[in-house]
Amino acid sequence: MNVLIVDDEPLARERLARLVGQLDGYRVLEPSASNGEEALTLIDSLKPDIVLLDIRMPGLDGLQVAARLCEREAPPAVIFCTAHDEFALEAFQVSAVGYLVKPVRSEDLAEALKKASRPNRVQLAALTKPPASGGSGPRSHISARTRKGIELIPLEEVIFFIADHKYVTLRHAQGEVLLDEPLKALEDEFGERFVRIHRNALVARERIERLQRTPLGHFQLYLKGLDGDALTVSRRHVAGVRRLMHQL
């Protein structure tokens, strides 16, 4: 896959080019871009599959560039590589598939590049278009701070949310992350896709597999993607879960 690097710092461009060059299956396009205007021009002429994009640049910044790319039918995948970690929310709004904080590590870059396939790009671009009603609608991704920087998790990959004191654990297809968001706020935003099964747990409706009663009279909910593990359903939510399962 062809990769275009966009950064206003020459040393940063050189380092990213070196890291990409060490990975099989990727080719760094020349020339690279040092600002947003150059980036858009080179994207038009070079047709990259992936853009490694800095955020803070003179003129058009990286978020503005990505927003313009969202307007295209088949935009390249955008992976932000930035020294700033405070732009994660804006990043998923412009369909970024990765958000890496400098200094970028080779293994994190490799993982982000793997996610940047063309079907995912088209899908992400569609997800970030405003609803026809004109409302803002729920997020298509959830951002979480991890050891790799800021991770953007597609909502369709989320299996459950479980609250534990002031944090919420998000379980997704590739693992778990911690969120600093109230469970109630997540329920209010994503209630059409998730159902409450306990005062501290929300599960993805489409992941529900079966409800089972234990010999002690408790109820366990088995979810697709959990490899046989189950979550406890509180008695007050059993009837609602059963009704939902009849509708699925």
From Swiss-Prot:
The keyword Protein transport does not apply. InterPro entries: CheY-like_superfamily, LytTR_DNA-bd_dom, Sig_transdc_resp-reg_receiver, WalR-like. PROSITE patterns: HTH_LYTTR, RESPONSE_REGULATORY. SMART domains: LytTR, REC. Coiled coil: none annotated. Keywords: Activator, Alginate biosynthesis, DNA-binding, Phosphoprotein, Transcription, Transcription regulation, Two-component regulatory system. One of its GO terms (cellular component) is protein-DNA complex. Gene3D superfamilies: 3.40.50.2300, LytTr DNA-binding domain. Residues 142-247 form the HTH LytTR-type domain. GO terms for biological process: alginic acid biosynthetic process; bacterial-type flagellum-dependent swarming motility; negative regulation of DNA-templated transcription; positive regulation of cell motility; positive regulation of DNA-templated transcription; positive regulation of single-species biofilm formation; regulation of DNA-templated transcription; regulation of response to reactive oxygen species. Residues 2-117 form the Response regulatory domain. This is Positive alginate biosynthesis regulatory protein. The gene is algR.
